[in-house]
Design a protein with these regions (language model features):
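N-terminal "arm"/small-domain region of PLP-dependent enzymes with the aminotransferase-like
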Residues: 3-22, 36-100, 232
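Short, small-residue-enriched loops and turns at beta-alpha junctions
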Residues: 82-83, 109-113, 164, 188-189, ...
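Conserved N-terminal alpha-helix of the aminotransferase class I/II PLP-enzyme fold
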Residues: 91-137
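Substrate-binding/gating loop at the entrance of the active-site cleft, primarily
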Residues: 137, 158-174
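Conserved PLP-anchoring active-site segment centered on the Schiff-base-forming lysine
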Residues: 146-164
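Active-site phosphate-binding strand-loop segment of PLP-dependent enzymes
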Residues: 181-236
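Active-site PLP attachment segment
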Residues: 248, 254-288
């Protein structure tokens, strides 16, 4: 295989008047972080090359990728169904651009584009739920939703193997007063013990529908029965199951539970749907 050269830069950036000095203490401090040290050790072991530093020059319909003039098969794409190359998708984009432009130009708190309302209704019909709400990404959904549904006096249980964005949202919820408990494995008995032990106003358990690193699925049926039986709500980040797992691709949660009426399920629009965004299932009252 031909060796690739990345776009990774080196050395100090010039700055008039020495303005870069204000960034040097920050750079030095961050360089000592354990995650940074791990990344740097990887780079040292691989001649300073990391995939994130490669500039993708072209992507063919058959997933051949071009980096630095070399061609490879791309097995790292998260466009699960290849819909980003589907002619009907391209046609819909071309038809919408003259009327709607490339950006809605406003917050959802100010107005909601008709196309967004239509998309949320179609997602709800596809999933068999009352309603859905679209977010810019799954990460933003998790960091926005978890602090909103688990506040002061509430218990938030998080599976340790859940996606990092779930943990980010959980930390924000904890900063807002929620009691945060991590469980090392999604064992319904352990979860039940935690709920019974903690005196909380309400309970939410956050977990992945499909673990992004292993592809495994947790015991959602047992967890839903346990959490709901003790007065709580199951919150499932099903980003990696949306569109590809279960009947009609409704995801791991729907495949396991049969219905999404009693849980909150976050799905991705950036993977199987090949666009950008996320959604959460909800009722009209929750959406309001």
């Amino acid at each position: 295989m031909a060796r690739l050269t990345g776009r990774r830069g080196g050395g100090k950036s010039p700055s008039a008047g020495g303005g870069v000095q204000g960034l040097e203490p920050l750079t030095e401090r961050l360089s000592n972080h354990k995650v940074t040290r791990l990344a740097l050790s990887f780079l040292d072991a691989n001649d300073g090359l990391h995939l994130k530093d490669l500039a993708l020059e072209t992507m063919a319909d058959d997933r051949r990728a071009s980096f630095d003039g070399h061609h490879f098969w791309n097995f790292g794409s998260d466009s699960f169904l290849g819909l980003d190359r589907h002619p009907r998708v391209h046609e819909a984009i071309r038809d919408a651009l003259p009327e709607w432009g490339s950006h809605n130009g406003a917050s959802r708190a100010f107005s909601s584009p008709l196309l967004t309302d239509e998309a949320e209704a179609k997602l709800a019909a596809w999933l068999g739920v009352s309603d859905t709400f679209i977010f810019p990404s799954v990460t933003l959904a998790n960091v926005g939703l978890l602090p909103a549904i688990a506040g002061a006096g509430d218990l938030l249980i998080v599976d340790r193997e859940s996606h990092d964005s779930v943990h980010q949202g959980a930390r924000l919820a904890a900063a807002g007063g929620a009691r945060l408990e991590q469980v090392p494995a999604p064992d319904p008995r352990v979860v039940a013990d935690v709920i019974r032990r903690v005196d909380a106003r309400g309970t939410v358990m956050a977990i992945d529908g499909v673990y992004s690193m292993s592809g495994k699925t947790p015991p959602l049926v047992e967890l839903d029965a346990t959490v709901r039986g003790l007065g709580g709500t199951l919150y499932v980040d099903d980003a990696h199951g949306t569109g590809v797992v279960g009947p009609r691709g409704r995801g791991a949660a729907a495949a396991a539970l049969g219905t999404l009426d009693n849980i909150l399920m976050v799905g991705s629009l950036s993977k199987a749907f090949s666009c950008l965004g996320a959604f959460v299932t909800c009722t009209a009252d929750l959406k309001t």
